[in-house]
A protein has these predicted regions:
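N-terminal signal peptide c-region/cleavage motif recognized by signal peptidases
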Residues: 25-27
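Cleft-lining beta-strand/loop regions that shape enzyme active-site pockets
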Residues: 33-149, 153-155
Length: 237
């Protein structure tokens, strides 16, 4: 069952966008996952752990997530929440991760872990979710950002002498923008996100970044401020 699901993700992303499996940001430090203790008011002393991820997105990021979830078995209850901070990575990796998160019915929060236990008032500060990370964010059944976080998009890289606007590392890739944008529209529509996100993406050169305002994120149904989020969401058993 899992193999069929993973095969479906790979086929859905790679066949649809072809060369868009290329980078939107050259991976520097791979996305890493960890379980973080939580202490929310409505589950005092019995709160499930929360998954926190930071780094750049690999081409097969959904496989990394599933491997982490398997390793987490036996480590107590885990909430269906992913806190993410990422400058981007492989486009197809972000798309596949988004599909996987939706399949797992996980909520996604953009933010940076401070090293403390997560409570309703501490443990997270503002973070960044850019480029390919936005596809992962869109996959969340509920989507939030910590106040002050930055969420941004741009066109995929083309040509040879291009620096990613977030990582400032060189990228060498060629993308069929027309077919890629058509697939992105389908993806965001499936996830319940307004196509205004793709319009901003298509209009922003690869060496720049369009950062959404909080109002735009709400209007495009991309994410809401986490201050409006109820604590202690569903947990995985």
């Amino acid at each position: 069952m899992l193999n069929r699901f993973l095969d479906g993700i790979a086929r859905r992303t790679c066949l649809a966008i072809g060369a868009a499996a290329v980078l939107w940001a050259t991976p520097a430090a791979a996305l890493s996952y960890r379980l973080v203790d939580a202490d929310f008011p409505n589950c005092k002393g019995e709160c499930p752990k929360v998954i926190v991820a930071s780094g750049t997105i690999s081409q097969n990021e959904h496989l990394q997530l599933f491997a982490f979830l398997e390793q987490s078995l036996g480590h107590g209850k885990v909430a269906q929440i992913l806190v993410i901070e990422s400058p981007g990575g492989f486009t197809a990796g972000g798309l596949a991760l988004g599909y996987a998160l939706r399949k797992l019915k996980m909520s996604v929060i953009v933010g940076r872990w401070t090293g403390e236990s997560l409570t309703g008032k501490s443990g997270l500060t503002s973070g960044t979710c850019a480029s390919a990370c936005v596809f992962a964010l869109a996959g969340g059944t509920s989507r939030y950002f910590v106040t002050g976080s930055r969420v941004g998009v741009h066109r995929a890289h083309t040509g040879t002498a291009v620096l990613d606007p977030t990582t400032r590392l060189p990228v060498n890739a060629t993308v069929d923008h027309e077919s890629g944008h058509a697939f992105f529209r389908q993806f965001f529509r499936t996830m319940g996100v307004d196509n205004g996100v793709v319009e901003k993406l298509a209009a922003t050169q690869s060496e720049s970044m369009y950062w959404f305002s909080p109002d735009e994120m709400s209007r495009y149904r991309l994410a809401r401020d986490s201050s409006a989020r109820p604590t202690g969401e569903r947990k995985r058993r």
